[in-house]
């Protein structure tokens, strides 16, 4: 059985060689994620070119995702290495560029003294250390240690419950975004999204560069959770970034928020990735914990489009095993749940949405061997995918970039074909491609969804039941 949920792999030192990339793709990688928090453009370009070459050599439509760092708040560097802070210690965080020690450290975020008030909590290193702000003096935030531990260079700071005034896009993010648009990435992810209008900042730059790519919102701030429906509407997809989200929200809320995001994304035909610590123990062990296996399985059974590996594939000791393990878990979960995925109660709001819903229902009634979408933008395929039909979903497109973009969407297998001007020619393309590949046989029924006339994005208006091998003539 073909796996329907997609696998996103973060690339890094453990997986940047051509040999490792080939193994990753063979093991099941559908999307390669580039974490632009690390490395430089030259290094990333080298790996990007390798991904494209290896994927083309293997005949696989692997998508490539550029993940922008966003306004991540970090401490600076410590002059003599890590220091230990104990309960009750006074510790200062300053915007001055000073070497860190047991009494103070600098921060990358110049707006910290303006955002923090006495009594606010500051979390360090994903909440491993907890500080309470006691006063603000100019560019210095004085804190008292509530939960101590080791603190070292460049550790992250989280400010739960605080409205951070940092911009949606930093100068570094803008430079990285322009580079990614010019390089040829398939998708962009924006970190620390707080409001729907954050999408406008990125799209304005896309407009300047004359490149429009799908934009994913990473949900990792409580402010974003408060405005989920609007953010899902404003962006082209969502990543449930459970690392920072689990630090800033009560831990017990994360699974509930995750399921809510998946449901909202299915309603709006937006792809959704569940990310962070999915098989975390496999960074250093060849097998995951039972809890991790359950985590992946339930994300798949809840209807996520994709599940993601981070450190497991970027710096872990078992990157290939992590992908093959995730592949096996997802397949097993789908074998159990494919016919039992929650149906969407909400009726479609557009003509294209109504036709996609009808196609899924007609396919089940006539015993179709495939649901086929002809698409210029990928939207028709995404609308079909949200119904999670057990019938294989095949997308045909003449737009090469759409193949990479649909690599993130549940269940979609994409074929690149020449553009044709008539719907009957589309049907001939389907027959020729799928008979040659041995995917279908004469007499098989398929349900075809397309726009007429062909070539107009967003014009889905036709549904057709076709028997493979039957005569097709121009009308």
Where are these regions (language model features)?
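Non-catalytic helical/linker scaffolds that mediate oligomerization, partner binding
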Residues: 1-475
